[in-house]
Amino acid sequence: MKTQLIILLFSLTLNQQNSILIDFGKEKKGRYWNVVNDGVMGGLSKGGKKITKNSLLFMGEVSLDNNGGFSSLRKSFSEVDISNFSDVEIRYRSSGISFAFSLAVSRRWYVPNYKISLESTSSEWKTTIFKLTDLRKHYIGKALNDRLKKETLKDIIRIGFITDQKKYGEFEFELDYIKFK
């Protein structure tokens, strides 16, 4: 019996190290996420979130007025070491404007972050998997040539999503889960 317990505990530890799951349905992780719109710089875009039975729904409207043009959904700041992982899997659906998955290494808005675009799904659920090293460095919305380096994955302090085009329009973006593996 003691041996079985040790094996069970060891396998649970291995599973925890093999992936990190952010579940917006069953575990309701959406309460730790916040909406940030371009109002922080004078824009007039609107965005909101709603925790549903099985997901986190992010919806709103991007406005280009007053030099605006984005709405974002971001996890609260917290250190996340994802250096043991090479891939991220996201189950989502969207309509309207396209989105990007983003990782930040600084609290300062002017320090570059890393993004990768997500395909629009026409409101159909989609599961997408990509390499973390495929994320590209961006500086205030402009893509740079650098890709995310493996050693930078230990320095992540924020995970998020942002409208990926400076384009007017309504949007819905619904998340089931994010899994680092």
For each feature predicted by the language model, list its residue ranges.
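Bacterial Sec-dependent N-terminal signal peptides
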Residues: 1-19
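Beta-rich carbohydrate-recognition modules and glycan-binding surfaces
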Residues: 16-181
